[in-house]
């Protein structure tokens, strides 16, 4: 899985200001979640860090899905990166970190990367740029 957000016409400066502001929040939230991804943290910890960053900026009501899911034999499997999942994350686990902000009828955005936990953090399996194109 890999999700990036694009602006029709390719010029972020021409996107609505609320879109530009929300994308900056989304990128910061995803970066905070990636930084918190390490063995011993829980799936709920990663979700909470992501939601806190988005909610603090006023966009919390527009983040309507879990933060991520495991990548393995099934498309969606444990660890489900979501509130209430106290599963401790372990080295070698692969999962998505994919927060999104959606304003129905106006615009939506998601930023998704797959990470694999290492003994001291994570490795990102996606190499695509995270900026809006």
Which residue stretches match the model-derived regions?
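Active-site neighborhoods and metal-handling regions in enzymes and metal-associated proteins
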Residues: 1-133
